[in-house]
Amino acid sequence: MIEIKRIQQQPDLAQAIYAVMAAVYLVSPWTLEQIQADLSQDQTWYALAYDRAEVIGFLAVQENLFEAEVLQIAVKGAYQGQGIASALFAQLPTDKEIFLEVRQSNQRAQAFYKKEKMAVIAERKVYYHDPVEDAIIMKREIDEG
C-alpha cells in the first residue's frame, strides 16, 4: 500500500529523494547538496510517497502566506500511472494559488497538470538548459483543487 507523508526540515531524507530523481531523469536536475539545502529551508516542504520503507515519489513545494510553488514532482517509472502523482498533488493547499514551471516539450506533464486544474499563464524563454528550452508557467486558482 502506498502511503503519503508530508515532511519539513529533514535533510537526512535527501538521499532517498535524490534516488527518485536519478531513477526518473537522465540527469538529476538537482544535486544531493541542493536537495539537502532545500530540505533545510523554512518555507519548503515535501510530500513523500512510500511503498513500505522505499520512497517512490515526491512533491517539493515552496510556500508562503499567499501562494505555493511546485518545485519538483517525480514518481519512479514502475509506479507511474497508478495515481501517485495525483495523491502527491492532493497535498497542496487549496486556499492558495499554486504555480509551477514545466518544460515546453514535456507534454505528458502538462496534460497531468491540466487534469489537476492548472492553467497556462505565461512562458519563459530559454529558461531551461541541457537542453535549452522554454518554460511554460502554470497556475491553479484558489479553491480549484
What is each stretch, according to the model?
Residues 2-4:
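Extreme N-terminal starter segment of soluble prokaryotic enzymes
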